[in-house]
Regions:
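Amphipathic alpha-helical segments
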Residues: 17-33, 80-86
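A generic structural signal for short, solvent-exposed coil/turn residues
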Residues: 2-4, 24-26, 40, 49-51, ...
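Extracytoplasmic/periplasmic beta-strand context in beta-sandwich domains
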Residues: 8, 44-46, 99
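Conserved short beta-strand elements that form part of the metal-binding/catalytic scaffold
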Residues: 30-68, 108-116
Length: 127
């Protein structure tokens, strides 16, 4: 079945109890104003605004060492995971509403649901 995907986000994973302080640093470092702040039972996110159309940059509080990861959005997350597995990636697990994947190089990334397919750059079409 054909599906579409594209790069959607750059996520700065922060192993810290002070995510807003980290957001202030990255806001000033990147010249992007701090946006929305979302706190859940087990998660915390802060967005940065003013990025290129269709690309989000945000910070996420994590319990693992700090790093950066990419989000790839797809209209069919399972099909995209299978496509990337065929390229050598492996599924780490399903978390909330996305796949956590690992590239052959060891880099982790996520496959998230494509929310706004008509905004931003056109997605790649895969068959």
């Amino acid at each position: 079945m054909a599906h579409r995907s594209r790069l959607s986000g750059l996520i700065i994973d922060c192993e810290t109890g002070e995510l807003l302080s980290a957001a202030t640093f990255w806001s000033q470092a990147l010249g992007l104003p701090v946006g929305g702040h979302e706190v859940g039972e087990t998660s915390e996110y802060v967005g940065l605004e003013g990025t290129a159309a269709g690309l989000s940059v945000g910070l996420q509080r994590v319990t693992h060492p700090s790093r950066v990861h990419l989000d790839i959005e797809a209209d069919d997350q399972d099909a995209e995971a299978a496509r990337l597995e065929a390229l050598g990636a492996r599924r780490i697990g399903w978390v909330k509403r996305w796949w956590v994947m690992e590239a052959p190089t060891g880099h982790r990334f996520c496959i998230v649901k494509m929310d706004k397919p008509d905004e931003g750059p056109p997605p790649n079409a895969w068959t």
